[in-house]
Design a protein with these regions (language model features):
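Short, well-ordered loop/turn and helix-capping segments at boundaries between secondary-structure elements
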Residues: 4, 24-27, 72, 86-90, ...
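Short secondary-structure junctions and interdomain/linker hinges
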Residues: 5, 9, 25, 29, ...
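PLP-dependent enzyme catalytic core of the Aspartate aminotransferase-like
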Residues: 39-40, 103-181
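Generic non-transmembrane alpha-helical segments
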Residues: 43, 47-52, 79-87, 130-132, ...
Length: 181
């Protein structure tokens, strides 16, 4: 005899989670959400390219993330990602095609749009986020941060008044778009 709970192994909760997820992605609301995620990423890439002269790998995106080549900005991805983090903007440092730098200190930065789309943000807010990213980058390009060791950079960038100002503005934006948990 086969009884419920004796079949499927110790991961029935994972199987149930997959089932719920598959049901959710089969709705018109999810399709609309997924399309907005891509629109937001495309808008972010376009803003960074056209207004702030960032080099976006492949010239744009057709998915949920933007991969930025920072070689023309003279700021390593690891440093920029940490500065963005202190400003309240989540990103990852990332290698880029043909990167000459090591994986722990690469030339690229990856940023995605699912979280902000989940909050309800659209193109108008993306325009502001791109502006903040450029402001943070300009702070990272200041002479005082050139040639600095990462452990020292982490401390100094956290104390930067402009980074703190941007973090407050980011927080205010997020408060307008609370997570519905």
């Amino acid at each position: 005899a086969v009884l419920p709970g004796l079949l499927g192994g110790p991961f029935n909760h994972a199987i149930a989670g997959v089932a719920v997820g598959l049901k959710e992605v089969n709705t018109p609301q999810f399709k609309e959400y997924a399309q907005q995620v891509v629109k937001n990423a495309q808008h972010l890439a376009n803003e960074l390219i056209t207004k702030y002269q960032f080099n976006v790998v492949s010239g744009g995106t057709d998915k949920h993330l933007v991969l930025i080549d920072l070689t023309n900005k003279n700021v390593p991805g690891r440093f920029f990602s940490k500065a963005l983090d202190h400003a309240g903007i989540v990103s990852n440092y990332n290698t880029i095609p043909g990167d000459l730098k090591p994986p722990l200190n690469p030339s690229g930065l990856r940023i995605g749009t699912p979280w902000i789309t989940t909050r309800g943000m659209k193109e108008e807010q993306i325009t502001q986020i791109a502006s903040w990213m450029d402001q943070v980058l300009k702070i990272c390009q200041e002479d005082r941060y050139q040639g600095i060791k990462f452990k020292d950079f982490k401390i100094e960038i956290k104390q930067n008044i402009e980074i703190q100002r941007i973090a407050k503005e980011v927080k205010q934006l997020c408060l307008q778009f609370p997570l519905d948990i």
